[in-house]
Amino acid sequence: MQLLAIGINHTTAPVSLRERVAFPLEQIKPALGALRSHLSGRSGTEAAILSTCNRTEIYCATDVLTPGTDGFEHTLRWLSQHHNVPAGELAPHLYALPQSEAVRHAFRVASGLDSMVLGETQILGQLKDAVRTAGEAGSLGTYLNQLFQRTFAVAKEVRGQTEIGAHSVSMAAAAVRLAQRIFESVSTQRVLFIGAGEMIELCATHFAAQQPRQIVVANRTVERGEKLAEQLSGQGLTANAIRLTDLGERLHEFDIVVSCTASSLPIIGLGAVERAVKRRKHRPIMMVDLAVPRDVEPEVARLDDVFLYTVDDLGAIVREGNAMRQAAVAQAEAIIESRVQNFMHWLETRSVVPVIRELQTSGEAIRQAELERARRMLARGDDPEAVLEALSGALTRKFLHGPTHALNHTQGEDREALLRLVPGLFRHSSHSER
């Protein structure tokens, strides 16, 4: 069984490409079924899909994906067809990691070493959600289950034994820093949050600490927006919720807009922002789009009075704190390397299980056949001593037939290898078992 991780992330592809191969949550289960069917349709193929604002990754365990074969191309072709993105456009940004490289990558991702925000913890929760979804879809098996359980254990070990999360500048904190660079004081600004998920909650908490003049939460289901607004109001702020459909009429009221929804299409168009800017009499408006796919049409960035930032734009601010954690990175990498070797040892032992089962099945078939023959001999009155002699002789000949035949018909290096191997296979204790 071969392991494979294929994907793109914030270091290999811009957000304009990442958003085109992102998987909305409701599409992941059917996508897993389609992927497994595409990979030769074998029921033994295991798969999981991780899709976040910074990465889209596919993890597979199958016997048809091996380096140097069409396996990598199969998965690339499926990803290309599923998202209607030309393979030639996607391939230069894709990484394909087999076996130990896939294991190492999974460990690094879960530990926050591969994140834009070095050491961030949100990715671990996202990976756990991806594994849970794959489990519900029935696409996990022995190999990926073991990989991810060890992945979660390694992430816990890394965070517990290193300071990888220290001095971390989160995306939410970076958004606040940007606002402080544009506006003299966040406390005099009106802030709109679009969405009510985990990322928006984190951003709202950071902005709330700056005591803005007003906070409004716009969400498709107003109840969720109201719940977040209530949490923020408890911090002595003026916060309320509106429906997403009210955006067009209310957008001009806000100086800062932070958006992160799961929409597959932009929810703020160029025309809506142009009208808002006009009604604001060209006072500047800052927009932070943390969604992938993007919530704000990219053409909005061309407007003179709009400062539009995406997740990629926030990367420079985030990286300012990364250099301070390089010692922790070295410690984390050492832990991960050790755990990769442990997992690969487990994987290698798993590879012999089918062979052992086949040997056991073959041996049992021989035993049953010779036992039945011995019973027939006893039933017709043959001497028991002769029957036992015949039984033991037949078992010995049949068990040794395979190795003997191989030794007689193998040549060159293969024969030399067998000559070294066979004696060890048939070595037995000098003390008979009783």
Swiss-Prot record:
Pathway: Porphyrin-containing compound metabolism; protoporphyrin-IX biosynthesis; 5-aminolevulinate from L-glutamyl-tRNA(Glu): step 1/2. Substrate binds at T52, C53, N54, R55, S115, E120, T121, Q122, Q126. InterPro entries: 4pyrrol_synth_GluRdtase (IPR000343), 4pyrrol_synth_GluRdtase_dimer (IPR015896), 4pyrrol_synth_GluRdtase_N (IPR015895), GluRdtase_CS (IPR018214), GluRdtase_dimer_dom_sf (IPR036453), GluRdtase_N_sf (IPR036343), NAD(P)-bd_dom_sf (IPR036291), Shikm_DH/Glu-tRNA_Rdtase (IPR006151). One of its GO terms (biological process) is protoporphyrinogen IX biosynthetic process from glutamate. Its EC number is 1.2.1.70. It catalyses: (S)-4-amino-5-oxopentanoate + tRNA(Glu) + NADP(+) = L-glutamyl-tRNA(Glu) + NADPH + H(+). Keywords: NADP, Oxidoreductase, Porphyrin biosynthesis. NADP(+) binds at G195, A196, G197, E198, M199, I200. GO terms for molecular function: glutamyl-tRNA reductase activity; NADP binding. The record marks H105 as: Important for activity. The active site is at C53 (nucleophile). During catalysis, the active site Cys acts as a nucleophile attacking the alpha-carbonyl group of tRNA-bound glutamate with the formation of a thioester intermediate between enzyme and glutamate, and the concomitant release of tRNA(Glu). The thioester intermediate is finally reduced by direct hydride transfer from NADPH, to form the product GSA. Belongs to the glutamyl-tRNA reductase family. Homodimer. Catalyzes the NADPH-dependent reduction of glutamyl-tRNA(Glu) to glutamate 1-semialdehyde (GSA). NCBIfam families: hemA. Possesses an unusual extended V-shaped dimeric structure with each monomer consisting of three distinct domains arranged along a curved 'spinal' alpha-helix. The N-terminal catalytic domain specifically recognizes the glutamate moiety of the substrate. The second domain is the NADPH-binding domain, and the third C-terminal domain is responsible for dimerization. This is Glutamyl-tRNA reductase. The gene is hemA.
